Amino acid sequence: MVRVLFLGPLADLEGAEERFFAAPLDWGGLLAQVSSRVAEQLQDSRVHIACRGSVLSDKTALDAKEGDEVALLPPVSGG
């Protein structure tokens, strides 16, 4: 299983802070498994994905394996 963490407003859109999906998990699989509202947000270039503790420079290259943790990182705003 792959543990997927939904951070910030993405958790609100998904209705959960974490979910578990069957491994392996790639970009297409992730989009198919999450809610349509989260899938839409993931298309935004300001939303990033971390896998195994590293932010992916190309989120479409996601290749999560058994036991991996994937974090969905919403845009950060500040003042």
Language-model regions: role of each:
Residues 1-78:
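Ubiquitin-like/PB1-type beta-grasp interaction modules and other compact soluble beta-rich domains
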